[in-house]
Amino acid sequence: MRVELAHRYDVPVERGFAFITNTANWPKFWPGFVRLEPGSDWAAAGDTARLVTRLLGRDRELAMTVKAFEPNRLVTYTSTQPGLPDAYHERHFEPDGDGFVYRLVVEYEPRSGIGGVFDRMLLARGIRRAFESTFAALEREFAGAPPPS
């Protein structure tokens, strides 16, 4: 399954990329963010970050490994999380006039059995909601923060 959604921001792509890929900013926009585990890196292919999020009332660790890190253009990574199918993610940063379009993509193979029903019906909907929440939080951050000097 592939879930994809995009949103345009009125800040330069360089500013958006720098903010979004800086792990210190993740608590400001990542839905359910609890903490980033020590030793996590997120700036080059091969880096791995372990993020703890609150999902359905429980803390869960999400392990993410960067596959491609192209400044101001693209970040791709894989993720594993207990109880969910492994996933492939794309974060696209597309210049658009004075701003940029941030396009989020998640691909996963639904599991077999009852887990597959969840993956096909509820997980895709949850991913879309997380995308929308991320977009709204970033909109607030970019609207309220002065540009870096």
Please place each PLM-identified region on the residue numbering.
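Hydrophobic ligand-binding cavity/cleft-lining segments
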Residues: 1-40, 44, 137, 148-149
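Short, surface-exposed coil-to-beta transition loops
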Residues: 2-4, 59-63, 85-90
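A short, structured loop/turn motif at beta-sheet edges
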Residues: 10-14, 41-43, 67-72, 92-103, ...
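Hydrophobic pocket/interface hotspot
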Residues: 16-20, 26, 49, 66, ...
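Short amphipathic alpha-helical signal-transduction/dimerization elements
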Residues: 24, 127, 131-135, 139-146
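Short beta-strand segments that buttress and anchor functional surface loops
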Residues: 48-54, 76-82
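Short, cysteine-centered beta-strand-loop-beta hairpins and adjacent loop/turn segments enriched
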Residues: 54-60, 110-114
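Beta-strand/loop substructures that line and gate deep hydrophobic ligand-binding cavities in soluble
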Residues: 78-133, 149
